[in-house]
Amino acid sequence: VSKQPGVETELLDIATMPLPTNDAGEAIKESAFSVAMDRADAIVIVAPEYNHGYCGLLKHVLDSCLKEYIHKAVGIVGVSAGPFGGTRVIQNLLPVMRELGLVTIFWDVNFSSVQTSFDAQGQLTDQSYVRRIDKFLKELLWMARTLRYGRENVAI
């Protein structure tokens, strides 16, 4: 996606960021995460599935920002070592995204048996995912551009 004209990407690993210290998320306000969310037109969340859900750290970090998310596109990628490819984590995140003011795209990407889908350098080895990833990224960019136009030009 970063090869698209006018598109900049940034990878944020929430496991390496300061944790919110209370329900208001004061430790993360004005942090790299908050600033990146404010600047972003779109967000891709890659979430592993744990016991049919997502990890508490993801929920805690997501809840630490609110105004930064309003009317921004989000795409969700589910990851699982099992056969379901994170389908259940995606289903669990959808209502959370809506509550946060994010606009989900209709394409998801699900990586089942993730341990065999990538090599040691993180490169995709299972080419059957390429078409779905392409559709996912095209939809995400379309939604991001459409919502950006709306945020900048349409008063609510």
Show which residues each predicted segment covers.
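Mobile beta-alpha loop/short-helix "lid" or hinge segments that flank ligand
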Residues: 10-21, 67, 100-120
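Glycine-rich NAD(P)-binding loop of Rossmann-like domains
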Residues: 70-71, 120-125
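Short glycine- and Lys/Arg-enriched binding-loop motifs that mark or flank ligand-binding interfaces
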Residues: 49-52, 67, 78-82, 118
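Short, glycine-/small-residue-rich phosphate/pyrophosphate-handling segment
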Residues: 73-113, 127-131
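A glycine- and small-aliphatic-rich helix-loop capping segment at beta-alpha/alpha-beta transitions
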Residues: 60-68, 94-99
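N-terminal beta1-alpha1-beta2 submodule of the flavodoxin-like/Rossmannoid cofactor-binding fold
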Residues: 1-65, 123-156
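Short, structurally constrained coil/turn elements
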Residues: 3-5, 70, 105
